[in-house]
Amino acid sequence: MATIGIFFGSDTGQTRKVAKLIHQKLDGIADAPLDVRRATREQFLSYPVLLLGTPTLGDGELPGVEAGSQYDSWQEFTNTLSEADLTGKTVALFGLGDQLNYSKNFVSAMRILYDLVIARGACVVGNWPREGYKFSFSAALLENNEFVGLPLDQENQYDLTEERIDSWLEKLKPAVL
């Protein structure tokens, strides 16, 4: 088992594709990505380093049945983590959103995961600058005007995804390897 676990929730399959790309770029130092609807709490807690990916649905929600998803996803999985101790774990987040059509909640679901893992004692790494995006609001922005993780827009900036992932992974290396 590798020391890095990649977990994702998805609605349309785009987050799964990005998780697979990240796994490929990590070239053997991470286990294959796990969809949270098939993952167990024990699998999640077994990794010292977690890369967590989510799309943002509706009004800034995590994917899940309550948000209109067809399947269970992050909404349901986070319930299994309500008492989890993530102290000593390093977490990095990536989120998918559409900054033009959902400008008022661009990648806001990343903030829900961020708040959850911080409250459980994890150390979050991999903040990303706001520059290069055009949106009106994102709950995923911190006070320093950086995102809590890597925002990706597969609808409007898909041509920047691979370059952004490469830069983000380089930034993460000192903290996760």
From Swiss-Prot:
This protein's UniProt keywords: Electron transport, Flavoprotein, FMN, Nitrogen fixation, Plasmid, Transport
Cofactor: FMN
Protein's name according to its UniProt entry: Flavodoxin
Any coiled-coil regions, as ranges: none
GO MF annotation list: electron transfer activity; FMN binding
Function: Low-potential electron donor to a number of redox enzymes. NifF is the electron donor to nitrogenase.
PROSITE patterns: FLAVODOXIN, FLAVODOXIN_LIKE
Family: Belongs to the flavodoxin family.
Gene Ontology process terms (BP): nitrogen fixation
Pfam families referenced in this protein's UniProt entry, alphabetically: Flavodoxin_1
Lineage of the organism: Bacteria, Pseudomonadati, Pseudomonadota, Gammaproteobacteria, Enterobacterales
Organism field: Enterobacter agglomerans
InterPro entries associated with the record: Flavdoxin-like (IPR001094), Flavodoxin (IPR050619), Flavodoxin/NO_synth (IPR008254), Flavodoxin_CS (IPR001226), Flavodoxin_lc (IPR010086), Flavoprotein-like_sf (IPR029039)
Span of domain Flavodoxin-like: 4-173
Superkingdom of origin: Bacteria
